[in-house]
């Protein structure tokens, strides 16, 4: 489609910066994406009373999202490679916005499960689209920063949601919170459709900016022809990426799904009181994750190899998560700081991985690899919410109550990144571009 068949450049002369407008669009789409995901978690205490579901049932509803999310990650990876980023993201966002709004039409655990299946089906196209867009629109040295900017939407969404969802639910009812989230997606499409194209085709990109974008993208010579999806599994780099995502992606889902419940069950804070804690957590995460995104790019600009810079970042981010179990034994605001640091480390880790995918595979394969990795992460996310819900139900009647369950879960979250680092390093000691047939 248009990303793969450039037409002659428009001839604009001054140095433009339109690539940053593109990454801003990706940022806002990611923020909307995460608002849609988080609304259910924020309304859980209210829906607990209305629906009478158990923690395990709530976990199953969220696992339903992960099932279709895992499948659609791969489907959209293929679809985006075939039809282009613009069309692929348009279809993805249309599907998930309709599904988000449909949550406001249901009134049972089964109804929410069906709505979550639809949401997962649409949202699987988001990150493959973003990763491939960054690969097309940014030179290597800027990709990590660009990825950290769009991925920071995963923090901004959860900052905005606790601040506005409780108010909407109180004034207009909880159903309207879901409906308005769906409307926001269609508003974003009104900007995406007229402004997005490949940089070679964009009338908003000047010749100097286009030269800058293409300056070190020598993998274009390795980017002709279709992607052999099964063939990707022959590369150790693919396995390194997908296993790392399988281990660490479920941790991000855990925070998103269970944090409002954590503050309610362990601190007695309902959403009208805990929203400020949640906003602060994601604000900390946003600021520090942008710093993390800058950090590895800074090392590369100082002359470090991509391998050395990205692996240094990965191990530092992994170590930052280790103290998070102390949140169970600390004051509410110390817990906020520890969880915020852990979330920032996760998002810095994640943006590092997105940049690694862009560095190690030619652009024609980036969306496919991102899709495979996203599927692996979502498969991990299928099981972890059910396990978390089951564990919390089992601990409910013990002496420590659900706090004991959360202590175990926080312990799992703290150690998995170190394990993932060594798995990744064993399979991919160096991040060098794969030469594909």
What are these regions (language model features)?
Residues 40-41, 233-292, 346-354, 381-389:
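Extracytoplasmic gate region of multi-pass secondary transporters
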Residues 52, 84, 105-111, 122, ...:
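Helix-breaking motifs and short loop linkers at transmembrane-helix boundaries and internal kinks
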Residues 38, 66-74, 124, 158-159, ...:
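Residue-level signature of mid-helix packing/kink "hotspots" within the transmembrane helices
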Residues 188-196, 324-329, 411-437:
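Multi-pass alpha-helical transporter architecture, strongest
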